[in-house]
């Protein structure tokens, strides 16, 4: 149950009954400190100002008609007109019982929407590098959360599989194939192959002429070029899939919807934009001038949709892409996990999409932008030699460092178990370090911090889970075989349940805002509440069996919530570390 939403509805009804205009915001939030209750209604002052009345007097009117029977044990007016709400112990215990009995932990399914999520999007014939990490794991965490809430999510891996560079790549692939027979699907060094192709193109005029010819042939559907192009895509995606599998990212080959998918739509779109009077000829190119964006001279900015030579641009593809996602995929929402530097480009494409009537305003187009991954020097994360860090190399190093960590913590474990634990911790550490930061900010990549057992890190959260799970091993009972009712006998129990009952609020916030750090913060706070409870409230040596069973139930609900929350982030838990 979303208790915040429940109370918000109740306060909204009371506001209206007290004379507020219909639809006035109740602005119910989780209280910052326990002395202000569990929730606080902050909307009274704004309404009182609107009505020209004293805020505290109006707050009292609201309280007089506020029905929180069976939910709150106390309400009070604080400061200039805040309403503090204290949840009743009986209500909390009842909600905790219901959550523990529910495989979904009390989280309701939402009314299903069709949501397209555009994330990862690496380029063909290039290896994935650290720059692809944020889009891939942030997008995947949000997708998992949306699916958990019951939405139909279509993953769209918008790979860069088209463009003039394919002429030189096909020409080089042909050369390699002629020299060494069949090209291996391993093609180990994609980056090397790309650099070699570029060098040949720049230095060998005969090769360059052939490459330019292959661009034209590929675009006109030549069978040989199409076959070579497909081989390049296959080789690249086989390598990318290894990274996805290692990272426990839910993308597969079936989710690939590359730039090439929209090729046939582009001439029709430009023709339609011309017919609507949106695209006009300017110096031989087709340009859409947008009043919403100004150039440095304060004039409407021109967005080119077709070059003078007849070629199309990324903007044209993005217009086609949005149109396809609405018309063919039936999207209610489209989420783009693309770095913040692309914001203006996307906004311009979407402005054209709306003006042309391709996607109605009722369909939400959302840019879930993210900042950069920086090194300790505050500059973009690079190798020591100043090169781009390959994603596979980063994951390899994470596994080596995690193995050293596990060896130092638990050397007596069997080798295969140590390796399995190290792999799980390594991938979790890389992902959680990113997911726990607000996605719009740049963040500093720091091995020592991400593998620490203190603070808001993956090892800390995974250890928090194993610590709770160990209670049941010591008790010799299963989490699913507990008797009696949850009874609150201590303030720390009440505080733990109140935090547990905020799980649905965290889940819904991640889904609504595309911000996985909300879940990380919630889980970290929950682990802290459990520690306080564990120290203050003995479980296995509780004063009587009823209290012991009740506290075991709270431990079970905590373990299940941490496990489910981490699962939504694409992170596995461990039974022991």
Curated annotation (Swiss-Prot):
UniProt GO molecular function: arginine-tRNA ligase activity; ATP binding
Record-linked PANTHER family: ARGININE--TRNA LIGASE, CYTOPLASMIC (PTHR11956:SF5), ARGINYL-TRNA SYNTHETASE (PTHR11956)
Subcellular location field: Cytoplasm
UniProt GO cellular component terms: cytoplasm
Catalytic activity of the protein: tRNA(Arg) + L-arginine + ATP = L-arginyl-tRNA(Arg) + AMP + diphosphate
Protein name, entry field: Arginine--tRNA ligase
Lineage: Bacteria, Pseudomonadati, Pseudomonadota, Gammaproteobacteria, Vibrionales
Quaternary state and interactors: Monomer.
Its EC number(s): 6.1.1.19
EC class: ligase
Gene source species: Vibrio vulnificus (strain CMCP6)
Similarity section: Belongs to the class-I aminoacyl-tRNA synthetase family.
Swiss-Prot/TrEMBL keywords: Aminoacyl-tRNA synthetase, ATP-binding, Cytoplasm, Ligase, Nucleotide-binding, Protein biosynthesis
Positions occupied by motif 'HIGH' region: 122-132
Domain of life, per lineage: Bacteria
GO biological process: arginyl-tRNA aminoacylation
């Amino acid at each position: 149950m979303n208790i915040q939403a429940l109370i918000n509805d109740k306060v909204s009804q009371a506001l209206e009954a007290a004379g507020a205009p219909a639809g006035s915001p109740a602005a119910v939030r989780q209280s910052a400190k326990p002395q202000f209750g569990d929730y606080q209604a902050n909307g009274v002052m704004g309404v009182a100002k609107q009505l020209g009345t004293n805020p505290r007097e109006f707050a009292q009117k609201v309280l007089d008609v506020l029905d929180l029977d069976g939910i709150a044990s106390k309400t009070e007016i604080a400061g200039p007109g805040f309403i503090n709400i204290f949840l009743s112990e009986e209500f909390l215990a009842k909600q905790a019982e219901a959550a523990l009995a529910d495989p979904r932990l009390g989280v309701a399914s939402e009314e299903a929407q069709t949501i397209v999520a555009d994330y990862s999007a690496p380029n063909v014939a290039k290896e994935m590098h650290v720059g692809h990490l944020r889009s891939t794991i942030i997008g995947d965490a949000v997708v998992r959360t949306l699916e958990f809430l019951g939405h139909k999510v279509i993953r769209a891996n918008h790979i860069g599989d088209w463009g003039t560079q394919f002429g030189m790549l096909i020409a080089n692939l042909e050369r390699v194939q002629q020299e060494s027979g069949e090209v291996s699907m391993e093609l180990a060094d994609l980056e090397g192959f790309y650099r070699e192709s570029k060098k040949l193109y720049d230095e060998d005029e005969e090769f360059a002429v052939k490459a330019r010819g292959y661009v034209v042939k590929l675009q006109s559907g030549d069978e040989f070029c199409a076959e070579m192009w497909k081989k390049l895509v296959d080789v690249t995606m086989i390598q990318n899939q290894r990274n996805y599998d290692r990272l426990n990212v839910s993308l597969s080959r079936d989710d690939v919807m590359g730039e090439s998918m929209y090729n046939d739509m582009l001439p029709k779109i430009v023709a339609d934009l011309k017919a609507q009077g949106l695209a006009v000829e300017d110096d031989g190119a087709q340009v859409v001038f947008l009043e919403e964006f100004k150039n440095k001279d304060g004039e409407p900015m021109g967005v080119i949709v077709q070059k003078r030579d007849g070629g199309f641009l990324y903007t044209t593809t993005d217009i086609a892409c949005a149109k396809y996602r609405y018309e063919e995929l039936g999207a209610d929402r489209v989420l783009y996990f693309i770095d913040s530097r692309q914001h203006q480009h996307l906004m311009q494409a979407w402005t054209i999409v709306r003006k042309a009537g391709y996607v109605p305003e009722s369909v939400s187009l959302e840019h879930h932008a993210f900042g950069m991954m920086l090194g300790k020097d505050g500059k973009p994360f690079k190798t020591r030699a100043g090169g781009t860090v390959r994603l596979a190399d980063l994951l390899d190093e994470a596994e080596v460092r995690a193995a050293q960590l596990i060896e130092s913590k638990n050397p007596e474990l069997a080798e295969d178990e140590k390796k399995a634990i190290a792999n799980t911790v390594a991938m979790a550490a890389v992902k959680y370090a990113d997911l726990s930061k607000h996605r719009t900010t740049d963040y500093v990549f720091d091995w020592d911090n991400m593998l620490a057992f203190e603070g808001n890190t993956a090892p800390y959260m995974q250890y928090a889970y194993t610590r709770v799970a160990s209670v049941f091993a010591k008790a010799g009972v299963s989490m699913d075989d507990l008797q009696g009712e949850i009874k609150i006998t201590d303030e720390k129990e009440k505080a733990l349940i109140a935090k547990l009952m905020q799980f649905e609020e965290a889940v819904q916030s991640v889904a609504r805002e595309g911000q996985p750090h909300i879940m990380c913060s919630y889980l970290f706070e929950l682990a802290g509440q459990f520690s306080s409870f564990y120290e203050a409230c003995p479980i296995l040596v509780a004063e009587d069996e009823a209290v012991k069973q009740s506290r075991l139930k709270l431990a079970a609900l905590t373990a299940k919530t941490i496990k489910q929350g981490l699962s939504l982030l694409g992170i596995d838990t461990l039974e022991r570390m």
